[in-house]
Amino acid sequence: MRSDLDIAQAARLRPIRAVAADLGLTDDDIELYGRSIAKIDLGILQRLTDQPRGRYIVVTAITPTPLGEGKTTTTIGLGQALARLGKRSVVTIRQPSMGPTFGIKGGAAGGGYSQVLPMEQFNLHLTGDIHAIGAAHNLLAAMIDNHLHHGNQCGIDPYAIFWSRVVDISDRVLRNVVVGLGKKEDGPMRQTQFDITVASEVMAILALTTNLHDLRQRLGRIVAAYTRDGAPVTAEDLHAAGAMTVLLKEAIKPNLLQTLEGSPALVHCGPFANIAHGASSVLADMIGLHCADYVVTESGFGADIGFEKFCDIKCRASGLAPDAVVLVATVRALKAHSGRYTITAGRPLDPRLAEENPEDVADGAANLAAQVRIARLFGRPVVVAINRFPDDFPSEVEVIRQVARESGAFDVVESFVFAEGGAGGCDLARAAIQACEAPGTFTPLYPLDMSLREKIETLATKVYGATRVEYTPEASRRLAQFEHQGYGNLPICMAKTHLSISHDPKLRGAPSGYVFPIRDVRLAAGAGFIYPLAGDIRTMPGLPAHPAAERIDIDAEGRTRGLS
């Protein structure tokens, strides 16, 4: 089969005006970025206020291997399949960071015959939204140090500054840096760090905002530091929020692209799911739901992390609720969850993974059962999509089918969207349509008036399988501080590994009966959540020994080579 890049470059793209017209958008509603990309003016939401909303399908997954299990590919393929069935559909997905694109993971435009185009622009820069986010974030960082330099009227404690700087490249040497070296006029010297841009709270804010005024208010609420007396210092206190909003006035507009089969795709924002809430923007979903019969979106990683945050954070911010859930599973990942195989990104797969072994699938299927159970906690039907690989055996697929049904899945469907595009997802589309019409009421996992500890313990016991939570003294102090400062009604955004339902990436399958540790707790007041830290979570990745960047080049005709 041809590479993703070859397939993408061979495709004939529709004019983006024609794609916009499929959604009922006029030339007044879009701003062109070349022939194949446009931004959508937010005024469309006022014009379409009285339009009925379409159905809302969210795609999640079992706990993935480091290679991923095809969730984005399934999302795009399902959108294409719905269009083939005569439904007006749109997919809404995240814009990828260039860090993973140049590292091990590669791009995030889907795969095979279920991709978003133009693939090169999608993976690299797009319309510059991530750069605008980085500029807004770094403006606040610069104004903090400038405030210290010019007298520190707010009384900021230099040892209680929590606002780093960001760059959208994986660069491990920037994890710990010292700024202000040189003369006195070069600013105060202090230790700080760089994070990758998509880990910025500004990214999470942009993804959760509902309009420009809301964006301005959220940016003003960012707590960047504390005074020596322990009082929060906000971006509003530093008079930075207005300029930050101006830098984001174009980035707030969702980007319109198209799938390989020419159906609409909205690409907007890209917060990480292990650090932030891991979903594309509220605004893209709102526009899609007013313009289409079906919106297909995705949540990051497995149901335990991305889907839970989608429901408890994103849906609360948007006021929207999913009609159906599609949960992606693969034979390969469930074999890995048996504990008999190790899958490492950038290394050859164990050849035994390609051998027929339904017993290994059965031994790893506890993860599938747990993720279906987690997804069902929120009250909507779950369709399990078996993302088929060429070396899967019918006996192995049957194990997935049986376990999914026993776990309460609404339906179980094989998906071939990687190899066949929308045509390979029509059965999945029919199942998703039926699931949207099934009875059931969407319900978040916990009420916001619970204490922060109660919310954390609800997550740990009901979702992660732990028996109890253990807090470090620092974490306990932070929780008390945030409650005292009036942040106790915020939802929880757990920062934990995506490679296990637990906090420990080595615990595969469905861990249970363990203690869930919270080592620290942090506040994202602008985004509107509290994020406890469970385990070692890095906000600045590093590059592997042989990063994908080594294979990427361009020929004399301007065609990109080696991008995946």
UniProtKB/Swiss-Prot annotation:
Pathway where this protein functions: One-carbon metabolism; tetrahydrofolate interconversion
- What processes does the entry annotate via GO biological process terms? tetrahydrofolate interconversion
Q: Which Pfam families match?
A: FTHFS
SUPFAM superfamilies under this entry?
P-loop containing nucleoside triphosphate hydrolases
What is the protein's species of origin?
Roseiflexus castenholzii (strain DSM 13941 / HLO8)
Say which domain of life the source belongs to. Answer: Bacteria
Q: What is this protein called?
A: Formate--tetrahydrofolate ligase
Instruction: Report TM segments.
Output: none
User: Where along the chain is ATP bound?
Assistant: T65, P66, L67, G68, E69, G70, K71, T72
Alphabetical list of NCBIfam families matching this protein: PRK13505.1
The alphabetized UniProt keywords are:
ATP-binding, Ligase, Nucleotide-binding, One-carbon metabolism
Tell me what reaction this enzyme catalyses: (6S)-5,6,7,8-tetrahydrofolate + formate + ATP = (6R)-10-formyltetrahydrofolate + ADP + phosphate
Q: According to the UniProt entry, what is the EC number of this protein?
A: 6.3.4.3
Family statement: Belongs to the formate--tetrahydrofolate ligase family.
